[in-house]
Amino acid sequence: FRRAVSRAGLNPYLYQHANIREQVSWAHVHDRAAATEKASRIVDAAVAKAASLRPLDKVRVAAVHRTLVVGGGPAGLRAALDLARWGMEVVLVERSGGLGGHALRLGSTYPTDEPGRALVERLVAAVAVERLIDVRLSTDVTDVTGYVGDFRATLRSQGGAEREEEIGAIILATGFRDYEPAPGEYGFGDPRVLTLPAFQERLYAAPKGADLASVAGVDGPVRSVAFLHCVGSRQVEGLDRTNGRLNAYCSRVCCTATVRAAAETRRRFPDVRVVDVYRDIRTYARDQEAAYRAAAESGVLFVRVPSDERARVETAPPRDSYPLLVRTRDVLTFGAELELPVDLIVLATGMVPGGADELVAATKAPTGSDGFLLEVHPKLRPVESAIPGVLLAGTARGPMDITESTTTASAAAAKVATLLARDQVEMEPFVARVDPSLCSATGACLEACPYAGAIAMKDVEIDDGVVVKRAYVNPVACKGCGACVAVCPNGAIDVNGWEIGQYLAMVDAITGEESAPGSAAKEEVAAR
């Protein structure tokens, strides 16, 4: 809409949108008269605001053509490579001593069955020969200041040495951590209860001919294995034990990984009974249903737990030949009570946020209720954070597989390349501004502002050479949140495009009796 206004020769910010689709026609389908009245008042309010709009210019800042990528897993590697191949300098920071992340331990990736290590090694080799990528291992990002186009990031090595880097944008590819069950959660802590990542690593690394007991690292024979889904994911208060946090989200990749591990166990050890205990199986991506079918065809037995119940893991009585019992009801057999004797239990643990709290605090990138980094919009702006110039990639923004991780990384890199393609970065002008004639330098705005460097006190010379303090807004650092407007005792601060006077004009238009167009329309609709 603003581009259309601009093509007509007007300032693009002399435009006000009256949203009568979502706010009226979709919300009040069954009340035409009231909907028409509401639409009329919304239009009245938009007209009232439009009458007081002022021409605005975009905020422009010189761009540093260098990007900081935080995280050396598949997503970080992919983002760094894409940027370098577009001719942009990259600083790639990884807190551990090597690149690759969790993917290194994956014995097989879906659907190609390529080992995770082979996939990662290709990316690492490409990064190693790319002259535009500066890799910093064993390094943390301890502080970030500045704004899009001109950030300052403080990097600290494990030896304690600090170095400041000038960068134009940041891609957070900080990854995830595996959920670690609480002691006793589904029997965790017993040497015969393993997490899925630990079991997979041992299974795919095992030499041919090894028995399952030696692969799992347990004493005695392993004749029966139970895989338990949704450990640390889809948790319900009152039903699930937690390890300090209730994780209500689905980790998405666990089901496919679990049924593939179960099928692989059957393939390698055909004499072992394998039972898959689940509430729901979500092999969600294209062609991944084939993994479920392959597991079923290999002889894996499936037991479905009622959604409002949980399977129970118990130590078997001493006289039993099996050390562990899994008790549950099975929906597939019409609620039959089952007691499954097993030698080994594998817990399909989910993903939890990557533990980059210090970095998140430094960048002020918001997180969702699940603790993962929050995108602006999952469909329209899926790799952008609410902080301009801070992009998200991979599992930093939520559980996903390697294909999705690298795809989001490429999307984030493309966004950065577009952002820093010119010598200047342009930003919307909806930022705070101060009227010096009303400001009395109380400092309330500084205390309320959540963004470092957005407001400062400056010396201003007034009549007769007198120097006084006045608030000053840095339009590049300001995000237009309006916190300063709310606390200023003198009304000296407004936000461009959303001034107090404009709000009042809209309220008057909505509540005033002069809303004749709406009244007339209401009468016309009622008469039909």
Identify the residue ranges that each predicted region occupies.
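Residues forming the flavin
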Residues: 1-528
